Amino acid sequence: GITRGDEVIVPTLTFIAAVNPLTRYVGAEPIFIGCDDSLCIDPDAVEAFCAGHCELRGGKLYNKTTGAHVKALEVVHVFGNLGDMERLTEIAQKYHLILIEDATEALGTRFTAGKFAGKFAGTVGDIGCYSFNGNKIITTGAGGAVVSNHPDWAEHAKHLSTQAKTD
């Protein structure tokens, strides 16, 4: 659902591989937001950006400066630390943002308290991504995994993983 010209909120502390699929390959523009003490994207800064620099029109969030549709929020869980998914989920719902989790560096990390207690990193948002590159927690040499609570998105990701063949 993210297309050329859309904007995506991303953290400043990340590796470019977490941003490239959204920007370089799809054509969206990144909006870099700072991180909190967890080293994950700061919910207060995300809320301040959405409330102060954007406006909701017709159920969509628009950047007042660029006029672009702000379509998604990407959370990158780093060094085993989890972003504040309770707050970030509320913000994503309030502003109608797709919530993407890059859980590569928190694979196996589980929420221990709150609304998401027992859930694993990457399973809270609309879509979760994991890399299995040679320098990651679990390696396969290359590749990764995508999980989603949207069956049609999961099916589309599966289609793309086979070089988008239709036979």
Whereabouts are the PLM-identified features?
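Active-site region of PLP-dependent enzymes
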Residues: E105-K119, V124-D167
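PLP-dependent aminotransferase-like
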Residues: I2-V78, L82-K94, I98-A106, R110
